[in-house]
């Protein structure tokens, strides 16, 4: 701890970030890492034995292709086969008509690259077109490196082998031999979330970060999609299982903030918590067995009173409704998403994005051809790889690519100087490469925030030490050239994406916040009664809120990187946005607490009280996008009916009023914390 205290704050934050990423718990991560690790070693063995060129490309296919579950790996493998056919076909067409004319070759390759980048952003199968774009631009370097058309044709044909045999290998490893099924990962993930919930129910623990809660909720939704596609039993009983996922998410996120020490430990409350934990354990056992859980628990009056006293009645009712749900309930038909985005041909940003990528590639091609420096051809690949829809995400990808390339270059340098002279055979080479590939595979299976570092590190290392050589190599020039090529491509891309049609998310962020607040207002309009339809609707919209707040949080992180904006305006926007996100999460949890006490309200009185909050929030959200929102002020009218209900509800709703009053005023020239007391609220 003393060593960390002596380090600069940015370094401490960076170390904390990597510690969080490297220690991430995710079902299927260990099998995916082992599949990737074994696949890399087999690629090296096969490529060295049969002298197959482009080892780095084969490794890249593995890193992009091996996914967290067998179904996803199969899907990506099919896409890779289609992409290989398209990309090799496009290369042969380019060579046939323009092999000896670089200008004509670029004129033909340019529209292909633009079309691929356009479709990458607008089509559901964007990964296919991304692969075609990579090979289309990488193939332009072959004629410059070789003077013989026959040799270029052979290299291009080798690309088919290089792309397809790792695809076959990852299918054998990840699908046939050692499959990791999505249904198994879902069962493990649900049980892990329930374990965390029980821990917070029985012990006083510090709450987990909200961002982690939201990411876990989104991970469950992604696994649900894979289970629907991969498991027939899950599809048959999908209505029950989707309700199970929503219920587990609600229990996990709600109990994360629960503190059992804040309530009196009467014997009735202690027994009720034990009974609730026992029911959750029964649910876990059924999930482990892959069975739909059915419960015969009926809450007695004393248990209901204890649940209300310790603020667990809504969780209890939600759990019991799941236990009493018919497993054979017919699922709601899912709408098939369109293959193209709705504004694909009306939004000019998509075509501008393609033009910017082409411009960056042409600048790099002109530079490396003009200086006759073939070793830095990775600059063109960099321009395509770091091309992202907006400035912030492009900068994030540039940092990841540069960081991975730097680590890979350092490892390649140390490997060439210290290890390579002592190697005599392929077995020794594999033993030395094993820890490097294992580290890269573990990083590559982390979250999207850092996974590309592992991929880039291994690919850069292979480019510098294993590319097209089938024996010991001591040439340090390769390491220098590959690293400089990546740096040049990153710099050119940064300049292009910053000054040529920059796509800033600064204007989109308030609209995103308004959408999240609008969804929160819909939650408030749902009747606060223990009715099946209302509860299910509430749970599903609540999951959407987790996704909305997480998307806003990630967008804030990207806007921070947009240095083309005025620093003061950017800082003000980020501070206001983070305040809205933080208060929105608090409002959601505070509104959850009102459900337990709102049962005593008359059904006719409920919409009026909830409507006050929903109307105020909708009015505030409508003004966020135009920077015309003031902090909402709500007056709670104390009618005889409201005075007759539990005083706990009034206190809870007054707390919601306080949270409303702390929402930032978007009309103020500078953000100041709200100090005005909300009407109807007490401190």
Question: Residue ranges of each PLM-predicted region?
Answer:
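C-terminal functional regions that serve as terminal interaction/effector modules
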Residues: 418-419, 423-430, 434-438, 446-474, ...
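Long, hydrophobic alpha-helical segments that serve as membrane-spanning/inserting helices
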Residues: 1-34, 41, 49, 151, ...
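Membrane-entry segments of alpha-helical transmembrane domains in multi-pass membrane proteins
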Residues: 27-31, 46-51, 74-82, 97-104, ...
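Juxtamembrane/interface segments at transmembrane-helix termini
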Residues: 125-128, 175-188, 447-451, 477, ...
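Pore- and pathway-forming membrane helices of multi-pass small-molecule/ion transporters and channels
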Residues: 9-18, 33-74, 81-89, 106-173, ...
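Alpha-helical transmembrane segments of multi-pass membrane proteins
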Residues: 61-62, 354-366, 376-387, 402-414, ...
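A cross-kingdom feature marking solvent-exposed beta-strand/loop segments within repeated
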Residues: 74-78, 96-101, 147-150, 154, ...
């Amino acid at each position: 701890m003393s060593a960390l205290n002596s380090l600069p704050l940015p370094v401490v934050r960076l170390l904390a970030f990597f510690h969080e990423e490297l220690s991430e718990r995710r079902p299927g991560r260990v099998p995916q890492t082992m599949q990737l690790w074994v696949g890399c070693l087999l690629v090296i063995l096969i490529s060295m034995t049969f002298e197959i060129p482009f080892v780095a490309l084969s490794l890249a296919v593995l890193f992009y292709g091996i996914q967290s579950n067998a179904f996803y790996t199969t899907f990506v493998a099919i896409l890779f086969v289609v992409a290989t056919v398209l990309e090799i076909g496009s290369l042969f067409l380019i060579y046939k008509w323009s092999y000896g004319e670089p200008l004509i070759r670029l004129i033909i390759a340019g529209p292909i690259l633009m079309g691929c980048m356009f479709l990458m952003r607008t089509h559901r199968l964007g990964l296919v077109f991304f692969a075609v774009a990579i090979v289309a631009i990488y193939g332009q370097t072959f004629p410059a490196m070789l003077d013989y058309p026959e040799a270029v044709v052979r290299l291009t044909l080798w690309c088919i082998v290089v792309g397809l045999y790792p695809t076959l290998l990852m299918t054998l490893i990840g699908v046939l031999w050692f499959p990791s099924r999505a249904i198994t990962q879902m069962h493990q993930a649900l049980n892990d979330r329930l374990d965390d919930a029980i821990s917070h129910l029985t012990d006083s623990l510090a709450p987990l970060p909200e961002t982690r809660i939201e990411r876990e909720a989104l991970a469950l939704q992604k696994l649900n999609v894979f289970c629907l596609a991969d498991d027939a039993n899950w599809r048959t009983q999908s209505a029950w299982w989707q309700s199970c996922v929503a219920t587990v998410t609600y229990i996990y996120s709600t109990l994360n903030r629960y503190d059992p020490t804040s309530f009196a430990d009467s014997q009735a409350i202690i027994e009720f918590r034990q009974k609730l934990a026992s029911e959750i354990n029964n649910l876990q056992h059924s999930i482990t067995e892959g069975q739909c859980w059915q419960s015969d628990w009926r809450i007695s009056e004393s248990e209901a009173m204890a649940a209300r006293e310790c603020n667990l009645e809504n969780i209890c009712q939600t759990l019991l409704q799941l236990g009493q749900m018919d497993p054979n309930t017919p699922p709601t038909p899912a709408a098939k998403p369109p293959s193209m985005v709705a504004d694909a041909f009306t939004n000019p940003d998509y075509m501008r994005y393609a033009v910017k990528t082409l411009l960056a590639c042409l600048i790099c091609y002109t530079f490396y051809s003009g200086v006759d420096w073939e070793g830095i051809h990775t600059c063109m690949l960099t321009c395509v790889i770091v091309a992202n829809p907006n400035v912030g995400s492009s900068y994030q990808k540039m940092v990841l690519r540069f960081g991975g390339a730097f680590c890979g270059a350092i490892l390649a340098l140390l490997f060439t100087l210290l290890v390579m002279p002592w190697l005599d055979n392929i077995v020794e080479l594999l033993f030395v490469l094993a820890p490097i590939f294992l580290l890269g595979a573990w990083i590559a299976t982390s979250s999207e925030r850092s996974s590309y570092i592992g991929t880039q590190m291994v690919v850069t290392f292979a480019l510098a030490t294993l590319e097209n050589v089938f024996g010991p190599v001591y040439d340090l020039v390769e390491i220098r050239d590959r690293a400089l090529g990546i740096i040049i491509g990153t710099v050119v891309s940064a300049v292009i994406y910053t000054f040529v049609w920059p796509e800033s998310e600064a204007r989109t962020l308030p609209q995103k916040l308004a959408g999240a607040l609008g969804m929160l207002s819909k939650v408030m309009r749902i009747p606060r009664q223990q009715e099946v339809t209302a509860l299910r609707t509430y749970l599903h919209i609540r999951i959407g809120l987790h996704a909305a707040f997480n998307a806003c949080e990630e967008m804030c992180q990207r806007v921070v990187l947009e240095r083309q904006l005025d620093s003061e305006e950017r800082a003000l926007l980020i501070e206001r946005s983070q305040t809205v996100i933080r208060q929105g999460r608090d409002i959601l949890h505070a509104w959850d607490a009102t459900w337990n006490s709102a049962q005593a309200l008359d059904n006719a009185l409920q919409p009026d009280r909830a409507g006050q909050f929903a109307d105020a929030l909708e009015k505030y959200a409508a003004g966020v996008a135009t920077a015309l929102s003031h902090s909402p002020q709500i007056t709670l009218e104390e009618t005889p009916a409201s005075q007759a209900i539990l005083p706990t509800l009034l206190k809870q709703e007054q707390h919601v009023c306080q949270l409303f009053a702390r929402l930032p005023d978007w009309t103020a020239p500078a953000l100041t914390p709200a100090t005005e007391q909300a009407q109807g609220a007490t401190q």
